[in-house]
Every structure is written in structure tokens, then in C-alpha cells.
């Protein structure tokens, strides 16, 4: 019985070990995003609609996988938020905005460190250097929220993955910063910031190829672990089968011996009588 339990526990631990890469494919920087992101809506409401925020926008957010632009975009967001923080006083009426921006700066700085730790050093990038542009609070924080969403699925990129963007793409043509697009902030509840987006939003944000690779990375370890689990189960069953057969035979022999002994005992008692 103890041997059976040992084999079962071994198979369970093996399954968990093989599923470990599957868990790591889900946003490795995701835990850096705190509930303070929900204050973005309040901050946008507090800022004048015609207030302009400077941001060095990284082109290609619509046409490239997130790992291509997120490392640069998050740095530029950090710089812009830091500049914005310096413009607000940390006393009196500016305290609310100052506190919100300060928390957002801390989040973005943590994401910068996470990207540096997990980005591929051999990744080739061919897009132009970001150029400073002016954005309204709605436009700026739309880019901010989309960058935050990208971290939900951020994984380590393949070393052979190239990030090439067409030379004809300009910030003005990028629909992500189109000034005519209505401002739609994502839900600000903490659960929605940590849960997956809807399938339609995922398709809009990620190219089909990137999504296919993501699902392949999830499916292959799962399939491999199932095959290994069945193989160990078959080997264990094959090993245990002869011993089980012998055990059944021994039980039958013992029962027959007991019956014979009982009959002999009764026969002796009858003869004595």
C-alpha cells in the first residue's frame, strides 16, 4: 500500500514539474501592476482636457508584437510621468494629483526593471527612435492603459524574433493614438486589471502569429506532461501486474489449504467418535 502511494505522489509531482513552464508563459511582469492603476480615471478627470503632455511615442504598437515595443514604451512613459509629477505640488490642492501620479511612476518604474530582466538581448529592432509628441490627458493615458494591458501577456521573446516595422508607418497613422478615436478607458476595478481581456480585445492588440505561438507554448508542455504521465502509469501497472497475479494465486492456494485442513480435522473428529 505504501509503495502504491509513493508511486502516485511521484506521478503528481512530475506533472506539476512539467506544467511549471506552462505557468511561466503567463505574463511574467503581471504581478508588478497594482490596484493603484484604477486611479487613472480620477486623474484624467482632474486634468484640463486641453492640457498637453509630452511623450516620446514608439511607433509600431499596432503592427508589432508587444515584446517589440513595450521595453521602449515603458521607459518613455516613466520619463513623461516623472516630468508630469514635477509640475504638481505635493501640498494643498495639488496633493491628490501628485499622489496618483507618484503611484503610477512607481508602477512604471517596476515594469521597467521587469522588462530589463526578461527582455532578449539579441532582439533586433529596426524602427526609428521615438520622437516627442504632445498628447491630451485622454490620449496619453489611453497609451498608458494599453501598455499596462500588454504586460498581462508579456513573455520572454525568442532570440530569433525580429521586430521590423515599415518605414512608412508614422505616429499620425497609428490608430492607437488617433485623436478622432473616442476615449475608452478599460474598467478600473482591480479584478479587471488583473484578469484577461476579452477575446476581441486580444485580437486587436496582438497579431495572429503572436497568439498562435502563445497557445503553442501552452499546449506543448501540457501534451508532453500527459504523455509522460501515461508512460509512467503504464510502466507501474506492468510492474505491478505479475505481483498482483501471484498474490491472487497465493490467496486461492491458502483458501484451498484451509479447506483441506478443515476437512481433515472433521474427518479425525468423526473417526474418534
UniProtKB/Swiss-Prot annotation:
Organism superkingdom: Eukaryota
GO cellular-component term (any): filopodium
Keyword Disulfide bond tagged: yes
Biological processes, Gene Ontology terms: cell adhesion; ectopic germ cell programmed cell death; embryonic hemopoiesis; extrinsic apoptotic signaling pathway in absence of ligand; hematopoietic progenitor cell differentiation; male gonad development; mast cell apoptotic process; mast cell migration
Keyword set includes Disulfide bond: yes
Bilayer-crossing regions: 215-237
Record's keyword terms, sorted: Cell adhesion, Cell membrane, Cell projection, Cytoplasm, Cytoskeleton, Deafness, Disease variant, Disulfide bond, Glycoprotein, Growth factor, Membrane, Non-syndromic deafness, Secreted, Signal, Transmembrane, Transmembrane helix, Waardenburg syndrome
Residues modified by glycosylation: 90, 118, 145, 167-168, 180, 195
Listed InterPro entries: 4_helix_cytokine-like_core, SCF
Residue ranges that the UniProt entry lists as topological domain Extracellular: 26-214
Cytoplasmic compartment segments: 238-273
Cysteine pairs bridged by disulfides in the record: 29-114, 68-163
Position of the signal peptide: 1-25
Gene Ontology molecular functions: cytokine activity; growth factor activity; stem cell factor receptor binding
Posttranslational mods: A soluble form (sKITLG) is produced by proteolytic processing of isoform 1 in the extracellular domain.
Site residues, Not glycosylated: 97
PANTHER family documented for this protein: KIT LIGAND
Quaternary state and interactors: Homodimer, non-covalently linked. Heterotetramer with KIT, binding two KIT molecules; thereby mediates KIT dimerization and subsequent activation by autophosphorylation.
Entry's family note: Belongs to the SCF family.
Protein purpose: Ligand for the receptor-type protein-tyrosine kinase KIT. Plays an essential role in the regulation of cell survival and proliferation, hematopoiesis, stem cell maintenance, gametogenesis, mast cell development, migration and function, and in melanogenesis. KITLG/SCF binding can activate several signaling pathways. Promotes phosphorylation of PIK3R1, the regulatory subunit of phosphatidylinositol 3-kinase, and subsequent activation of the kinase AKT1. KITLG/SCF and KIT also transmit signals via GRB2 and activation of RAS, RAF1 and the MAP kinases MAPK1/ERK2 and/or MAPK3/ERK1.
Disease: Hyperpigmentation with or without hypopigmentation, familial progressive: A disorder characterized by hyperpigmented patches in the skin, present in early infancy and increasing in size and number with age. Hyperpigmentation has variable intensity, and sometimes is associated with cafe-au-lait macules and larger hypopigmented ash-leaf macules.
Protein known as: Kit ligand
Gene name per UniProt: KITLG
Amino acid at each position: 500500500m505504501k509503495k502504491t502511494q509513493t508511486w502516485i505522489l511521484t506521478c503528481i509531482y512530475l506533472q506539476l514539474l512539467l506544467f511549471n513552464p506552462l505557468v511561466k508563459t503567463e505574463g511574467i511582469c503581471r504581478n508588478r501592476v497594482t490596484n493603484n492603476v484604477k486611479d487613472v480615471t480620477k486623474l484624467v478627470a482632474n486634468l484640463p482636457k486641453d492640457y498637453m503632455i509630452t511623450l516620446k511615442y514608439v511607433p509600431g504598437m499596432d503592427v508589432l508584437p508587444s515584446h517589440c515595443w513595450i521595453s521602449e514604451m515603458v521607459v518613455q512613459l516613466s520619463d513623461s510621468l516623472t516630468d508630469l509629477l514635477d509640475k504638481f505640488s505635493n501640498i494643498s490642492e495639488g496633493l491628490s494629483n501628485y499622489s496618483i501620479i507618484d503611484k503610477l511612476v512607481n508602477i512604471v518604474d517596476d515594469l521597467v526593471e521587469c522588462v530589463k530582466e526578461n527582455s532578449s538581448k539579441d532582439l533586433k529592432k529596426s524602427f526609428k527612435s521615438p520622437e516627442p509628441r504632445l498628447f491630451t490627458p485622454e490620449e496619453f493615458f489611453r497609451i498608458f492603459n494599453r501598455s499596462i494591458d500588454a504586460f498581462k501577456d508579456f513573455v520572454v521573446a525568442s532570440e530569433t524574433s525580429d521586430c521590423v516595422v515599415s518605414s512608412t508607418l508614422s505616429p499620425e497613422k497609428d490608430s492607437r493614438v488617433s485623436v478622432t478615436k473616442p476615449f475608452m478607458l478599460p474598467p478600473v476595478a482591480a479584478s479587471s486589471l488583473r484578469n484577461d481581456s476579452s477575446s476581441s480585445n486580444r485580437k486587436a492588440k496582438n497579431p495572429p502569429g503572436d497568439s498562435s505561438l502563445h497557445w503553442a507554448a501552452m499546449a506543448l508542455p501540457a501534451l508532453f506532461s500527459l504523455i509522460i504521465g501515461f508512460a509512467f502509469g503504464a510502466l507501474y501497472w506492468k510492474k505491478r501486474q505479475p505481483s498482483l497475479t501471484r498474490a491472487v494465486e497465493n490467496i486461492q492456494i491458502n483458501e484451498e489449504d484451509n479447506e483441506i485442513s478443515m476437512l481433515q480435522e472433521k474427518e479425525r473428529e468423526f473417526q474418534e467418535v
